């Protein structure tokens, strides 16, 4: 069995800004970014950096292999042991592996160095210069590193095996319904021994610890240095099927037996499910047609960039689910396996993607894109959540020959009818199109499915994608667009929510089978001096009004393990003197009653108009006669009974700070570090948020955690936020905040 040594701690790091000006070594743990990021992507660092650590391995059995697994390293990486270069890797979003067997001696302390370069490189996807890019890349070893010790007779690693359509363990659902299911298990076995080895391969599927299906191959003999694929089928009766509403997962245990002894074993989670895409039949999961609401996500987190540990990735997935979304497009690059695991567990359907945005380079770049497509499928093929593979460069002109290579790579790597490639040019299995491009109602190509990849942003920001991204020429009026920070006030937040209301209604009236609004979180970008404020949550994951609109589109009966749903109601106003007297209430209830200072203002049903008629739950609209300070209370009713309640109170003078640590009850596992946002809310004597407050707040920590970035922060819309890094093993840390006069 493989012995995995996690190498996330005890690294030494330095930046090499020039050949003669290396910075001093500093001790760091992974995941790590080589710089503290500002919120807008303006103060990025680019250059060479090095990670070094001591590596000492115990005595090994004969012919064992020792393989270094790097989760991701931005952009290019050189691997050295004791100063000797062993490998170079190009590509910053996918894992790579290096066989260190011949470089490591038993019991000897070796020096492992990874030298990274995150500078612009037109040959490495995404290829486009950072200063022209509508997102950010960062740098460093921003995912985990492991040393995997493989026995002589072993199951290979999917990435490094280099097998088209194979390598490692590949599981596919061949058929599935409520009565039965058939799963294919393809296992790649290699004999690194100097003598032939005889073995059998066993595959077990377990549900809640109980074996629900098992298969054992006949005995095979493998010559020295040879490898073979063993493919078997497992039958399940009355299977637990994976779906967004019920994301049932099995544990697949794959074992190699020599006689009665297990010599290697792998365990992974797997969902039994079948997806389908067609214009006539829509998007189906296990034969059931679903019309899922979705979003787009960039994987960055403030201050730390891409260096988000497991718990932070899971929190983002939970935020997406709780925002009312059951589908997410990973824009525009492969994202963390931890995030993918969370989507598996929470029931979030995923459009996976290779790196690319508005750029297509030369032959070397295109070869790298095809290799990225292959490696992406090999990495993510066993994830239940992945329904679509964007093996295409987003919003990029591509030749027919290049697109044919990308499409073919997907089908070669994942044979059968469950591979659905997609792209913004109609050359793939599924056509993905953005609402601003104007064809979501008119496009048709036989029975091919259409997915609205993006909506709710660009169509309100610029007339089309042809505006000048450098000068801003052609951008529509700011008041009408969807790009609004929380601090811009109530009118801006209402406008964003209204835009999304209209846009979602329009996409639901189209023949599209899935849709994804742009975007779930605000994000930094290279080409613009300010971060993009198009998220339904800001960059610190604080909600805007539009977040609650999407929450309201989920039915009141929906809830699940690991996330909160159910009946909800939200009054979309700050209820201050300048507030609009027409008040929208977002709710998934049948009726809503609004009261002001205890006086009923009416009980209404949803406001169904030509702009809301296709929504599952249109907003409720109340026209108030005048402003009166105090408390607005909305009560939602289902079946005549109160099901949800929300109150908004006119803010008075700031009185105190309230601190919240945004963990969402998701904790790091033992031995893991964490990154979490901490918010200080400026509230009045009644606890109402003072949305106009912009006070400076000073944060202090105790107990071993550290603030990443500034400790003195100006509040936006009454909330000041910082990012805290928590080292592995630190559990009892404290945070305090103070502001003048509070």
Question: What label would you give each PLM region?
Answer:
Residues 105-109, 186-278, 622, 648:
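Extended acidic/polar, glycine-enriched regions
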Residues 555-582, 588, 643-677, 683-686, ...:
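Short S/T/G/P-enriched beta-strand
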Residues 1-37, 115, 121, 141, ...:
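Accessory carbohydrate-binding/adhesion or oligomerization-edge regions at the termini
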Residues 317-319, 327-550, 563-574, 580:
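Substrate-binding/catalytic cleft of secreted carbohydrate-active enzymes
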Residues 197-202, 244-251, 588-590, 594-605, ...:
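Short flexible loop/turn segments that cap and initiate beta-strands
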Residues 33-57, 61-70, 74-81, 87-90, ...:
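Active-site-adjacent substrate/metal-binding segments within catalytic domains
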Residues 3-5, 12-17, 42, 46-157, ...:
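Accessory beta-strand-rich segments of carbohydrate-active enzymes
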Residues 185-188, 254-255, 583-587, 635, ...:
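Beta-strand-rich structural segments
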């Amino acid at each position: 069995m493989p012995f995995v040594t996690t190498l996330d701690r005890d690294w030494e790091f330095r930046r090499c800004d020039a050949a003669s000006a290396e910075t001093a070594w500093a001790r760091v743990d992974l995941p790590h970014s080589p710089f503290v990021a500002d919120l807008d992507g303006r103060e990025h660092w680019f250059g060479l950096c090095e990670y070094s650590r001591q590596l000492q391995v115990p005595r090994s059995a004969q012919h064992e292999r020792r393989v270094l697994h790097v989760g991701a390293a931005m952009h290019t990486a050189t691997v050295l042991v004791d100063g000797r270069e062993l490998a170079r890797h190009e590509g910053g979003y996918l894992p790579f592996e290096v066989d260190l067997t011949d470089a490591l001696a038993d019991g000897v302390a070796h020096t492992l160095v990874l030298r990274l370069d995150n500078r612009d490189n037109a040959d490495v996807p995404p290829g486009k210069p950072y200063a022209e890019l509508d997102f950010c890349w960062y740098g460093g070893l921003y995912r985990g590193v492991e040393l995997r010790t493989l026995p002589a007779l072993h199951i290979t690693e999917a990435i490094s095996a280099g097998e088209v359509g194979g390598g490692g363990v590949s599981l596919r659902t061949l058929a599935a319904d409520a009565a039965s299911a058939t799963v294919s298990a393809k296992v790649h076995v290699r004999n690194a021994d100097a003598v032939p080895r005889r073995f059998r391969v066993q595959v077990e599927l377990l549900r809640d610890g109980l074996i629900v299906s098992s298969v054992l191959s006949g005995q095979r003999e493998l010559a020295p240095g040879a490898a073979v694929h063993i493919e078997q089928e497992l039958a399940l009766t009355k299977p637990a099927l994976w779906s967004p509403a019920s994301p049932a997962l099995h544990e697949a245990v794959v074992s190699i037996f020599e006689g009665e002894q297990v010599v290697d074993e792998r365990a992974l989670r797997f969902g039994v499910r079948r997806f389908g895409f067609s214009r006539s039949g829509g998007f189906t999961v296990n034969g059931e047609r679903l019309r899922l609401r979705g979003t787009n996500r960039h994987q960055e987190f403030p201050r730390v960039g891409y260096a988000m540990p497991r718990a932070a990735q899971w929190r983002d997935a939970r935020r997406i689910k709780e925002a009312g979304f059951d589908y997410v497009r990973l824009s525009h690059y492969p994202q963390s396996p931890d995030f993918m695991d969370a989507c598996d567990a929470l029931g979030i359907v995923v459009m996976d993607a290779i790196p690319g945005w508005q750029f297509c380079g030369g032959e070397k770049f295109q070869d790298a894109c095809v290799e990225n497509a292959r490696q992406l499928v090999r990495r993510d093929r066993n994830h239940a959540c992945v329904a679509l593979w964007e093996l295409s460069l987003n919003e990029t002109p591509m030749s027919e020959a290049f697109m044919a290579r990308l499409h073919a790579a997907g089908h070669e790597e994942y044979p059968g009818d469950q591979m659905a490639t997609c792209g913004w040019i109609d050359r793939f299995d599924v056509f993905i199109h953005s609402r601003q491009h104007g064809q979501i109602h008119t496009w048709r190509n036989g029975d091919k499915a259409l997915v609205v990849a993006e909506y709710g942003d660009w169509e309100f920001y610029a007339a089309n994608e042809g505006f000048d991204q450098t000068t801003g020429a052609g951008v529509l009026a700011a008041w009408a667009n969807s790009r609004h920070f929380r601090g811009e006030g109530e009118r801006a937040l209402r406008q964003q929510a209204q835009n999304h209301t209209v846009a979602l209604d329009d996409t639901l009236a189209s023949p599209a089978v899935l849709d994804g609004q742009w975007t779930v979180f605000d994000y930094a970008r290279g080409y613009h001096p300010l971060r993009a404020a198009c998220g339904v949550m800001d960059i610190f994951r604080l909600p805007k009004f539009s977040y609650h609109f999407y929450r309201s589109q989920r039915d009141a009966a929906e809830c699940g393990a690991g996330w909160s749903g159910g009946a909800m109601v939200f009054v979309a106003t700050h209820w201050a003197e300048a507030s609009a007297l027409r008040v929208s209430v977002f709710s998934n209830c049948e009726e809503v009653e609004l009261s002001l200072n205890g006086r009923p203002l009416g009980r209404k049903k949803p406001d169904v108009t030509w702009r809301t008629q296709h929504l599952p739950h249109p907003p409720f609209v109340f026209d108030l006669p005048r402003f009166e300070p105090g408390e607005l209370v909305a009560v939602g009713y289902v079946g005549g009974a109160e099901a949800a309640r929300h109150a908004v109170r006119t803010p008075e003078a700031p009185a105190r700070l309230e601190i919240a640590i945004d963990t969402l009850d998701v904790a790091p596992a033992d031995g893991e570090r964490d990154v979490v946002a901490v918010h200080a809310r400026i509230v009045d004597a009644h606890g109402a948020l003072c949305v106009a407050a912009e006070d400076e707040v000073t944060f202090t920590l105790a107990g071993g955690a550290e603030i990443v970035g500034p400790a003195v922060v100006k509040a936006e819309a009454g909330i000041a936020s910082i990012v805290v890094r928590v080292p592995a093993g630190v559990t009892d840390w404290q945070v305090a905040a103070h502001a003048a006069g509070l």
